[in-house]
Amino acid sequence: MKKSLLLAVLSVCLLPLWGQANLSQIDSLVRKMLPEASEVGISVYDLTAKKSLYTYHDTKLSRPASTMKLLTAVTALSRSDADNPFCTEVWYDGVIEHDTLQGNLYVVGGFDPEFDSLMMDSLIEEVITFPFSVISGQVYGDVSMKDSLYWGHGWAWDDTPEAYQPYLSPLMFCKGAVEVTVVPGSQQGDTASISCKPASSYYTMTNRTKTRTPSAGKYSLSRDWLTNGNNLTVTGNVSTFRKDLVNVYDSGSFFMHAFLERLRAKGIVVPESYGFTELPADGVEQMARWETPVQKVLNQLMKESDNLNAEAMLCRIASQATGKKHVTAEDGIV
């Protein structure tokens, strides 16, 4: 808290000092505001004159934190292709005849971190404009844009099942998380009512709550994450309305499961299950496409310090900078 206060004070105090050669007043602020045994690194750089004005422990290495999101955003925006949208596409092979797609459907992920339920519906609406109601082949997800590492470098394994640590995939749906709304019952001891968004059979729910019953224990929302399960469990005392998020395992499968569910809801006969494979290089045609403006991704990245959006932006930088079809996070850093 004191470190945050120091940064805020520095920001205000430095404003009248811009353009002055002597910034030694910062030293007294550091001594006065910084708690004993804590550390801070400061570098004041004049972008116009291209020279350093003040440094304090500026070369000391620390574990990277959310300040890296600023560097990621600046790097992404500095590119000539910065305005290119994040895309999710549906392709097909084979032919459409007699109300049947005699071929396969491919959903190609472009690591859109803002792809939500409404966007899924829009993508489905495009698909059903084609003259078929049966898919005789398979439905595949293409997640080949990035490697299979589903957490960013340095992420703590025990932060799951928090929603700020989703399982990364080029096919993200609702940020790889479920929003759980819990409403206490009318009588003490009643089981609270629970609703979830997005609704899906991909996950199950166990409700062990009690309304205004302290003996039921502290309220908790979790998931059987140690076994990579998707049974959401809500337990404990519910005294007021609550709305929380929990991640699910894994994001690519969550997307594809929801995609098939919504095709079925529109009357399309689809296979019982889905698979994952890369889109063939030849013999395919595009069926649908959703584009998310980069500004929407940046807003969430910078204003909400969104981990998912930062990783998606890093992956995008890697793809644009290297020209590779398959990238890793390291490709965006080097």
Predicted ranges, named:
Residues 213-334:
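A small/polar active-site loop signature that marks catalytic segments
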Residues 1-25:
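Bacterial Sec-dependent N-terminal signal peptides
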Residues 20-60, 86, 126-130:
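Beta-lactamase-like hydrolase cores
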Residues 41-45, 55, 104-108, 138-142, ...:
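Soluble periplasmic/extracytoplasmic beta-strand elements of cell-envelope proteins
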Residues 50, 64-82, 139, 171, ...:
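Active-site SXXK
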Residues 108-218:
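Polar, glycine-rich mid-to-C-terminal structural blocks
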Residues 48-49, 60-63, 96, 111-115, ...:
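Solvent-exposed loop/turn segments at secondary-structure junctions
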Residues 78-93, 102, 272-273:
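Short, well-structured active-site flanking segments
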